[in-house]
Swiss-Prot record:
This is D-alanine--D-alanine ligase. The keyword Nucleotide-binding applies. It is an enzyme of class 6 (ligase). The gene is ddl. Binds 2 magnesium or manganese ions per subunit. The keyword Cell wall biogenesis/degradation applies.
Length: 361
């Protein structure tokens, strides 16, 4: 009898998307194929504490519970909470946002010489930064919304013209979105149409990041697709997000029970548009050197039916309402099989990396 693969399921973290991470981890924990895998949950609290095995399992059933006798992850001598886990064969990180999907955690796995689900270090860092994603997408021939990046030193300079709404509006139009460059789940995002709103939006976005993007508003419908694989990735169908009039897909609309947004899977769109969304997604996935998985978000612009890239989510949610697993379920890959494939792709990439030379003989 073959031994089961030991999976380290890492979730939580010091992130604005902490609750989403716990919901995702709960679903993975419940749906993973227990005939193939033994799961060892590793909970990092929102304060950055590492929980033991027993508490990590409890929080998956009760997300509001607080860890007993916590140990700060930052203090290496206190990572004793890992002693009650066996040697892990593969890590499945589902830590959203900063430190979880920006290359930091992925770098740790590389140092530990362990396979892990999702992007490698470079792709994780690139796709977390919305501006870098835009630059690479443009080079790949994928349309993106016009933007201006405002960095912290510019924000601290009262004479910088990027702080002047009239100047920015002359470049991008008067209808704008302001967002942190390195955040997800619409955290810190504001829609602005005047000077007062612009100043408030900048202040809000700079709470979350040291670089903020100001983008033209692309009027249309939000469309998403999902990509799975390494060198020969497959692209799922397309889903559409139907928002209430004058609203957009906010954090609350994504996860609140009273959401005013609905998901349409598959999207009721002409086949030509569906294929364009899928082709653009593949281009972006490859241009950013993603591997394993990614959800590619775009806007279908009303005026000309152009598909305009919004962002790449290289560690998408796995909650009950998350688009990524739903899109693959719609094309015949159920949740449990999807988890298995993601772990298989992680092992495949790791095995390939081991064949590369790292020193000159």
């Amino acid at each position: 009898m073959t031994d089961k693969i030991k999976v380290g399921l890492i979730f939580g973290g010091n992130s604005s998307e902490y609750e989403v991470s716990i919901m995702s981890a709960h679903n993975i924990y419940e749906e993973i194929d227990t005939n193939k895998f033994d799961v060892y949950p590793m909970w990092i609290t929102n304060d950055g504490y590492l929980a033991n095995d027993a508490d990590s399992r409890k929080v998956l059933d009760n997300p509001k519970m607080e860890v007993a006798n916590p140990h700060k992850v930052a203090n290496i001598s206190n990572i004793v909470e890992l002693k009650d886990r066996p040697e892990i064969d593969v890590f499945f990180p589902i830590v959203h946002g900063n430190l979880g999907e920006d290359g930091c955690l992925q770098g740790l796995f590389r140092v530990l010489d362990k396979p892990f689900v999702g992007d490698d270090v470079l792709a994780a860092a690139v796709t977390m930064d919305k501006e870098m994603t835009k630059i690479l997408a443009q080079r790949a021939g994928v349309p993106v919304a016009k933007w201006i990046a405002v960095k912290r030193f510019e924000y601290n300079d009262p004479d910088n013209n990027k702080l002047d709404y009239e100047y920015v509006a002359s470049q991008l139009g008067s209808d704008l979105f302001v967002k942190p460059s390195n955040q997800g789940s619409s955290v810190g995002v504001s829609h602005v149409t005047n000077e007062k709103e612009y100043k408030v939006a900048l202040a809000e976005a700079f709470k979350y990041d040291d670089k903020v993007l100001v983008e033209e508003t692309v009027h249309g419908t939000e469309v998403e697709t999902a990509v799975l694989g390494n060198d020969k990735p497959i692209v799922a169908g397309v889903g559409q997000i139907i928002n209430a009039k004058d609203s957009f897909y906010t954090y609350e609309n994504k996860y609140d029970d009273n959401s005013t947004s609905t998901l349409e899977i598959p999207a009721k769109l002409p086949e030509g548009i569906v294929e364009k969304v899928r082709k653009n997604a593949l281009k972006v996935f490859q241009a950013t050197e993603c591997s394993g998985l990614a959800r590619i978000d775009s806007m279908l612009r009303t005026e000309d039916k152009e598909v305009v890239l919004t962002e790449v989510n290289a560690l998408p949610g796995f909650t009950n309402i998350s688009m990524y697993p739903k899109l693959f379920e719609e094309v015949g890959i159920p949740y449990t099989d999807l988890i298995t494939k993601l772990i298989d792709y992680a092992m495949e990439r790791y095995d390939h990396k081991k064949t590369l030379l790292h020193k000159h003989d």
